[in-house]
């Protein structure tokens, strides 16, 4: 009897953990642009903007180049625990949530991320909290997927 209860409880516990995964996963990558925050969504259904990535530059709607230096980038993410802007990316009513999708959907931006070639945005990422893909998604999300970003902060 106790084994049956345990076996039936395991899927319920797993479902509960999955449903509340955002509280267990910690803060998601986020940037502030003016009065707006742009954050990677915990769950794709939460996001107003979905972006995807392609390895084919001909399929891209936005090109993001990985810069070799922070000076050569429009946007830089560098982990620096001693120089963090506390609350710079606090979630608020104006927070835009961005999800990274496995494939292109509708009019959603398709990002070509590369170290070479022409680019709409240039990013520099040296971080344990952000990946280059997440930084690219946030920068594109900050520009509504179509416009160049002027200034952002962590």
Named regions from a protein language model:
Residues 8-16:
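Bacterial N-terminal signal peptides
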Residues 17-21:
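Sec/Tat signal peptide C-region and signal peptidase I cleavage site
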Residues 1-8:
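Bacterial N-terminal signal peptides that target proteins for export
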Residues 23-154:
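Repetitive, compositionally biased segments used for assembly/scaffolding
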């Amino acid at each position: 009897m106790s084994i049956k209860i345990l076996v039936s409880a395991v899927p319920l516990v797993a479902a509960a953990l999955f449903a509340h995964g955002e509280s267990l996963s910690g803060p998601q990558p986020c940037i502030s642009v003016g009065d707006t925050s742009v954050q990677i969504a915990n769950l794709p259904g939460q996001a107003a903007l979905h972006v995807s990535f392609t390895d084919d530059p001909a399929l891209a709607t936005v090109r993001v180049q990985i810069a070799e230096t922070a000076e050569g980038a429009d946007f830089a993410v560098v982990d620096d625990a001693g120089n963090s802007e506390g609350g710079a990316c606090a979630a608020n009513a104006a927070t835009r949530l961005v999800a990274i999708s496995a494939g292109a959907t509708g009019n959603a931006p398709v990002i070509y991320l590369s170290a070479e070639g022409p680019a709409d945005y240039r990013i520099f990422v040296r971080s344990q909290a952000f990946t280059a893909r997440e930084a690219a998604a946030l920068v594109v999300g900050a520009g509504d997927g179509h416009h160049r970003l002027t200034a952002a902060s962590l």
